[in-house]
Curated annotation (Swiss-Prot):
It comes from Dictyostelium discoideum. Its main location: membrane. Keywords: Cell membrane, GTP-binding, Lipoprotein, Membrane, Methylation, Nucleotide-binding, Prenylation. This is Ras-related protein RabS. The keyword Cell membrane applies. One of its GO terms (biological process) is intracellular protein transport. Belongs to the small GTPase superfamily. Rab family. Signal peptide: none annotated. GO terms for cellular component: contractile vacuolar membrane; endomembrane system; Golgi membrane; plasma membrane. The modification Cysteine methyl ester is found at residue 218. It comes from the Eukaryota. GTP binds at residues 16-23, 71-75, 137-140.
Amino acid sequence: MAKMDHDYRLNIVLVGDNQCGKSFLLSRYCDGMFVENGIQLWHGIEIKNKIIELKNQSTNEIVKVKLMIFDGNGGCKFKELFYENYLKHQHGFIIMYDVTNLESFNNLSNWISKIKNSYQTSNLYPSPEPILFIVGNKCDLIDDSKITTIVDLKKPQEFCDSLSIPSIHNVSVKENINVDLIFQKLSQLIMDTYPPPKISEIKKIKNVDSGGDSINNCIIN
């Protein structure tokens, strides 16, 4: 049997209003690409992965962690499938808003509620509550005088502080500002609080998430 190239796997899902840059974040982080004025042609559930190194606080060792990052986009039928299957069992959730779009910030509460109403803990996803991380994208446009819907960044910071949700509000996927930091911070938070079983132990768990996580359970490598 081939040796695994990672010790743990974390599932992370991207959610937020349309046009906030979720798909571009996925491409920037996993592929190092950003297409100026690009058109999102893919409709459905897009999954990319990346292996990073994190510190295991309990053993003080550096471990390799494979991030499986899920992004749902497209029409209503894809969104319903996404909500039904991909908000239920994940290790972490990145909720994005656009700092130039006040409505996308105002909708953060709706996204938080949707996730909390869908999330279920399990052997593979041990956190009793969903682990959330809020991201404000397009900070490169914050000084653009042509944009009249800029979010006062004090408000999202106060909002996140009131809910004890970690966040980064000065992100630019276009300019590659704080992109890596998002995933590094969220992944480390998961590993420090409710880490999943090691990959080598997953197959030893019997009857894991029976009936509720058929899609995610098949992705264990």
